[in-house]
Amino acid sequence: MAAVRMLRTWSRNAGKLICVRYFQTCGNVHVLKPNYVCFFGYPSFKYSHPHHFLKTTAALRGQVVQFKLSDIGEGIREVTVKEWYVKEGDTVSQFDSICEVQSDKASVTITSRYDGVIKKLYYNLDDIAYVGKPLVDIETEALKDSEEDVVETPAVSHDEHTHQEIKGRKTLATPAVRRLAMENNIKLSEVVGSGKDGRILKEDILNYLEKQTGAILPPSPKVEIMPPPPKPKDMTVPILVSKPPVFTGKDKTEPIKGFQKAMVKTMSAALKIPHFGYCDEIDLTELVKLREELKPIAFARGIKLSFMPFFLKAASLGLLQFPILNASVDENCQNITYKASHNIGIAMDTEQGLIVPNVKNVQICSIFDIATELNRLQKLGSVSQLSTTDLTGGTFTLSNIGSIGGTFAKPVIMPPEVAIGALGSIKAIPRFNQKGEVYKAQIMNVSWSADHRVIDGATMSRFSNLWKSYLENPAFMLLDLK
């Protein structure tokens, strides 16, 4: 009996020590009703002792966390809040979309890192948010088993837990992606996600659409190949793109932001560069014929084939011969860096303003590869979903002003690049061949600008002549393709 009493006394003291140790390691503790609990941290014995059950604040009612705007790279310090995907009181899970923000370079979707309830939004639409400052307050979810007795909580095997997670897992996708899928009658369960943890991205939906039969309605070949004859000059009436704004008699002042703010910064730096201009005329008659032959083949692969892939590939072949045009200079023009990759930018006119995504590594891409990438960039650009990667890292730029209707331009270099080309519209103009015969020629004008601090006129002229020869005689490109 003495031995039993001694063991009971030792056990009671040990239990108190364990309680005290547990109490000291748990901050912000609440006291609940007395209960029996087994401290599983000591496997050598099991001990049940009446005491006040302990629980942390976070486990009791959830902890409010300030979700801050993290660094999104490229030296971006502030962004504009363009759209909220949540409101106060909404429940969110990890990787759910919180909002869409726009910097001076790209639009970015911010996703949650926590499971919980939105308690506060710090910004209204079009407000400026700063990196490192709170975006929202999220009350994290309390643990469901935190109020249960540890002794009575059944252990779940690893296999059972895994099975329940897989069975109950929901498809990961942002509201914008779900909306796009719904508009095109696509079941998200049929789409393979390429994002983190199988998240379905907008590119996955677009790729799924391209692979489906009839997902992209083909235009009538007759309409494309045999366009209706143009109206006489005297009957041509300019069509207004949009209605003129109604004059209210009041001036309106608003801040410059988004892509327009980026243009202010870039163009201000660009105009410090001494520009050298060079113009030429390109006969694209043979290229027009070649494209008409290749369009049905590209269309069968689900790709729209424009002239731009040929322009980009010809430029890349020219840059191999004149690498100084694929270079960049530092701010004070003390050092020049010759770029190994040909990341050729394409100026695009969008509702948000001028953006310049670029096709990466054109030097190792085929015409079809370039066309595929251009299709992707154009689709993402039309819905303002281009990533920062798509919009940065350019080494050379082409601006297709002719798609709007221009013939000549004076393009402005995008620093730190050293050259840019502007392409005019293609027009049918009478020209003489080598026999002196008049024929219908497809003429396009090109306007080049180069940084005259490092590029001389002869270099720009030789590059343009080489680029011109590839386009006027497309078969020549076959000799240099790699």
Swiss-Prot record:
Residue numbers bearing the N6-lipoyllysine modification: K105
UniProt xrefs under CDD domains: lipoyl_domain
Signal peptide: none
Peripheral subunit-binding (PSBD) domain location: 172-209
Region (Critical for association with PPM1K): 145-160
Cofactor annotation comment: Binds 1 lipoyl cofactor covalently.
EC top class named in words: transferase
Basic and acidic residues compositional bias, start-end: 157-168
Main location group: mitochondrion
GO biological process, one term: branched-chain amino acid catabolic process
Transmembrane stretches, start-end: none
Top-level taxonomic group: Eukaryota
InterPro entries: 2-oxoA_DH_lipoyl-BS (IPR003016), 2-oxoacid_DH_actylTfrase (IPR001078), 2-oxoacid_DH_E2_comp (IPR050743), Biotin_lipoyl (IPR000089), CAT-like_dom_sf (IPR023213), E3-bd_dom_sf (IPR036625), PSBD (IPR004167), Single_hybrid_motif (IPR011053)
Subcellular localization, as worded in the UniProt entry: Mitochondrion matrix
Region (Disordered) location: 147-168
One family name in Pfam for this protein: 2-oxoacid_dh
Named cofactor requirement(s): (R)-lipoate
UniProt-listed PROSITE patterns: BIOTINYL_LIPOYL, LIPOYL, PSBD
PANTHER family associated with the record: DIHYDROLIPOAMIDE ACETYLTRANSFERASE COMPONENT OF PYRUVATE DEHYDROGENASE COMPLEX (PTHR43178), LIPOAMIDE ACYLTRANSFERASE COMPONENT OF BRANCHED-CHAIN ALPHA-KETO ACID DEHYDROGENASE COMPLEX, MITOCHONDRIAL (PTHR43178:SF5)
Similarity comment: Belongs to the 2-oxoacid dehydrogenase family.
Protein name (record): Lipoamide acyltransferase component of branched-chain alpha-keto acid dehydrogenase complex, mitochondrial
Gene: DBT
